[in-house]
Design a protein with these regions (language model features):
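Transmembrane-embedded, aromatic-rich helix segments that form part
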Residues: 33-45, 105-110, 408
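Lumenal/periplasmic acceptor-binding loop at the mouth of the active site in multi-pass
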Residues: 150-347
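Hydrophobic, aromatic-rich transmembrane alpha-helices
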Residues: 109-119, 336-356, 410
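Transmembrane alpha-helical segments
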Residues: 137-147, 424-448
Length: 448
């Protein structure tokens, strides 16, 4: 997007936007978290294309970026699978053609229609948008590898997504338990019952049909319909939702296992989901890490540390009393908080660099927020994760690393304004370079 910014007024500038659409399509096949870069991209576009910048305009740009994410995530991705399923049923169950004929025909028709529309419509905005949609679709077809691999019947073929219907289930991650986001059940919620004759049954909402191929008849058959259980005692912003983890929630809130209050719900959100499952990982990278043993809240495993003894001992107890295996752990890295301080200075310096600096800050902030805290809100994680989840927030750490670089430039700029001595500026630059040197020497053994 920065290359587009440099060439946005040229004849070929829009090619960078089309390339971005293609990369987003490819990223769908890697991980959906890549879509969270869209708000930062849209803000760069807004700042470049509009001379008059206003808070209302920024809010509109952010809203449009949110709509783009919603379109790709909840309309485009499942919609392509749905339409492919309709074609598959028509061609196989009605026309009697072989399996996958409908899906292949749908993809061919999609590309034909998009190519025809690109040739027919020449207005710049519409033409570029159609190219973006085509490239998004081309990137999305990387999921064909999943179908091909599943049909090869490899030894490891979990959930066997060998047709469009099982592929849709795979894309929707239906093998995992879904977590409520804004409103829903808690771990103490009971199923809702409704009368049925002389008995009561659990109230459910009927979902879509589940199809499976019958290879003997050469057709798809409905084996069941999806059902969602309706619960009573729902709450807003439910964070403590999994009945399997009722006792684990108590460890983080100190509450009871009967029914969580909203206070306990928010306590869990702050102490576990925010502090333990995000800020702890953030501080690992920019302050220091105790060891690489997965922790569950205990003071000796997987915490962040500074390397400043009195401060670490105050938080976690006397670190010198830890067993030798933990003190000599290769994941023990101390940065003394220097990268964090330099990054915070970078934020301060960027924000105070007039109007342009504030615009740049907003782009980086939304990249930082959307690839960090927004993921925390969306995942709604339960205690006892099978592994550390720091990898999920790599984009957020990348954004803060940019602020560290800006902080180094800001320090040099600030000193240059106060002195003309090249020696002093050189000394400061050397000090700034010592920070990544310290990080490299500390983390080399964990990554060797």
């Amino acid at each position: 997007i920065l290359r587009w910014q440099d060439e946005s007024d040229t004849v070929y500038g829009d090619r960078w936007i089309i390339l971005i659409a293609y990369i987003i399509g490819l990223s769908i096949g890697v991980h959906l978290l890549n879509l969270l870069c869209i708000p930062a991209i849209v803000l760069v576009f807004y700042y470049q294309k509009y001379r008059t910048i206003s808070l209302k305009g920024v809010a509109a740009a952010i809203a449009i970026s949110g709509l783009l994410i919603i379109f790709i995530l909840f309309v485009y991705i499942p919609g392509m699978a749905d339409m492919g399923g309709w074609f598959e049923l028509l061609f196989v169950n009605v026309f009697g053609l072989p399996f996958h004929t409908g899906l292949i025909s749908f993809l061919a028709l999609t590309f034909f229609v998009l190519a025809g529309a690109i040739y027919r419509f020449r207005k710049r905005m519409l033409h570029t948008s159609l190219w973006c949609l085509l490239m998004l679709t081309v990137g999305y077809t990387t999921y064909a590898v999943i179908l091909i691999r599943a049909n090869a019947n490899t030894p490891l073929n979990e959930n066997a997504p060998d047709n469009i219907f099982t592929l849709k289930s795979y894309l929707n991650r239906e093998q995992y338990e879904s977590a409520p986001l804004l409103y829903g059940k808690t771990y103490a919620s009971e199923p809702e019952y409704v009368p049925e004759g002389d008995y009561y049954r659990v109230k459910t909402t009927k979902g879509s049909a589940v199809y499976r191929p019958d290879k003997e008849e050469g057709k798809y058959k409905i084996i069941r319909h999806k059902e969602d259980v309706c619960y009573t005692q729902n709450m807003l912003f439910p964070r403590m939702w999994s009945e399997r983890m009722a006792s684990s929630y108590k460890n983080w809130t100190g509450g009871n296992e009967v029914a969580p209050t909203q206070k306990e719900n928010l306590t869990y959100f702050i102490t576990y989901q925010l502090n333990y499952m995000y800020w702890r990982y953030f501080l690992w990278n920019f302050v220091g890490r105790q060891n690489d043993v997965q922790g569950s809240g205990e003071p000796e495993h997987g915490n962040w540390i500074t390397g400043i003894s009195w401060l670490d001992n105050l938080r976690l107890g006397d670190q010198s009393l830890l067993p030798e295996s933990l003190r000599q752990n290769k994941g023990h890295n101390v940065f003394y908080g220097l990268p964090l301080l330099l990054g915070l200075f970078g934020i301060y310096w960027q924000w105070n660099r007039s109007k342009k600096g504030k615009q740049q800050f907003s782009v980086l902030f939304f990249l930082f927020f959307m690839t960090g805290l927004a993921i925390v809100l969306y995942l709604n994680q339960t205690p006892g994760q099978p592994r550390e989840r720091d990898y999920a927030y790599a984009g957020s750490f990348y954004a803060f690393a940019i602020w560290i670089g800006i902080g180094a430039a800001g320090l040099c700029d600030a000193l240059r304004r106060k002195t003309t001595s090249t020696v002093q500026v050189g000394v400061l630059m050397t000090i700034c370079l010592l920070i990544p040197v310290q990080m490299a020497t500390q983390t080399w053994d964990d990554h060797d």
